[in-house]
Amino acid sequence: MALPDFTMRQLLEAGVHFGHQTHRWNPKMKPYIFGDRNNVHIIDLAQTVPMLSRALQVVSDTVASGGRVLFVGTKRQASEIIADAAKRSAQYYVNARWLGGMMTNWKTISNSIQRLRKLDEILASEASGFTKKERLNLEREREKLNRALGGIRDMGGTPDLMFIIDTNKESIAIDEAKRLGIPVVAVIDSNCDPDQIDYAIPGNDDASRAIALYCDLIARAAIDGIARQQGASGRDLGASEEVPVEPALEEASEA
């Protein structure tokens, strides 16, 4: 395997170059702005290309060394895409509301994850002896916990890298990552603060096609890292019970 390829044309077709209206910009983004068109900032894709390539390398290297990547995107148009990409690449995700202390208070989060596992056991048991109302309340509790924590229930600890869509919306997640020294890969739109991000990707963070492109590339970089890790350990990937789905095969099955 190798790092996923992408082209300037793909970025253009996905609308990665469209920033926000000029009056909404963050002046710190000036180095990444190509110009403006109809009062909308145009992001300099000549900078996005190498910065995205660098981010993909960081993701692959993190996973290849046994690290965990947490995908974060809770806005409506990112939620499902974030979850799908993380699952496809055997990583972790938060796609509902970010709970304060999710990283900095991991012990409390771990207790909630244990409660979620316990509810799974209870509700899977036929001989639980609960009334219909009690069972319904337990199912609601499980659904609420699963929505918040389902994507990190098997993470086993804080991640080694975070990938974030919309740094303004996910500012609490970024603050927690900074406090714990967790590096952050993130898309920075024209209204964002690039100083907070270790591996910034200048680009639109609102268009669903752009979000889908970033997430697909990051997922494929993680899969590349898995292959490198297994190759380095001498493990026979073809003999594994579960193997990552190659993007080319996935596309062929959908065609």
From Swiss-Prot:
What Gene3D superfamilies does its record include?
Glucose-6-phosphate isomerase like protein, domain 1, Helix hairpin bin
Name the segments for region: Disordered: 232-255
> Which GO MF terms are attached to this record?
structural constituent of ribosome
Question: Keyword Membrane, does the record have it?
Answer: no
- Say yes or no: keyword Isomerase present: no
Q: What SUPFAM superfamilies does the annotation carry?
A: Ribosomal protein S2
| Keywords tagged on the record | Ribonucleoprotein, Ribosomal protein
Q: Name one GO cellular component term.
A: cytosolic small ribosomal subunit
GO BP field: translation
What family does this belong to? Belongs to the universal ribosomal protein uS2 family.
Identification of the protein by name: Small ribosomal subunit protein uS2
The protein's gene is named rpsB
